[in-house]
């Protein structure tokens, strides 16, 4: 069905121009360029949300990549199990330590968050918090170790305000992703370059290589 829909979209593009993106801000097209000579690889998608909608990794998945999809929302992995059976699909939150944490579930799943203050800000029409549930959480390094995942090519994080906490749970010596996507909501580039997140990434040997409206692309200085 998805391929049929894509064919219909391509049919209306003049002269076959244009490219289809599944990500929220075209992040998957940036990744396609970054990995244009790599047909297979391993991704880890934290805050994966949906196997296709707003997905940074679906375009790579179609090319032959496989990996780990992680989302804390109850029931979120049912669609992944059906549409990405070759991946490891995990319903768990990523935090600095093993714990159970309150998770705010919205009528728009892309807004789901552990951040109570952000949830209060977003809880207004047309969006609404449907429930607050307790979910299991653990550091990303522990989760990947449990599933025997070593070096990866791409780490994509969309944790709605908790991206920096997720980054701090990575074992950078083991995973050493070639590319990291994370969010930063400042519109001021001077503020971005002065941020704790940017300092953290540069200290680990990463450079800011691209940016969409909210997403930052960091590439490893030792990337092959």
Regions found by a protein language model. Name each.
Residues 1-224:
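Phosphate/nucleotide-binding beta-alpha loop and adjacent structural elements of enzyme active sites
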């Amino acid at each position: 069905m998805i391929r049929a829909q894509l064919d219909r979209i391509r049919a209306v593009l003049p002269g076959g121009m244009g490219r289809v993106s599944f990500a929220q801000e075209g992040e998957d097209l940036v990744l396609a360029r970054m990995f244009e000579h790599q047909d297979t690889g391993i991704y880890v998608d934290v805050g994966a949300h949906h196997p296709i909608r707003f997905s940074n990794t679906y375009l790579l998945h179609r090319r032959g990549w496989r990996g780990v999809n992680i989302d804390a929302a109850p029931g979120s992995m049912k669609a992944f199990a059906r549409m990405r059976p070759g991946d490891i699909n995990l319903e768990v939150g990523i935090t600095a330590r093993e714990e159970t944490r309150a998770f705010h579930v919205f009528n728009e799943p892309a807004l789901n968050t552990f951040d109570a203050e952000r949830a209060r800000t977003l809880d207004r029409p047309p969006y609404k918090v449907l429930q607050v549930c307790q979910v299991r959480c653990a550091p990303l390094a522990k989760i990947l170790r449990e599933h025997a995942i070593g070096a990866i090519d791409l780490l994509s994080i969309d944790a709605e305000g908790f991206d920096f906490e997720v980054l701090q749970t990575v074992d950078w010596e083991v995973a050493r992703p070639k590319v990291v996507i994370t969010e930063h909501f400042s519109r001021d580039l001077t503020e971005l370059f002065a941020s704790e997140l940017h300092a953290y990434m540069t200290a680990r040997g990463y450079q800011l290589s691209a940016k969409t409206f909210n997403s930052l692309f960091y590439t490893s200085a030792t990337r092959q």
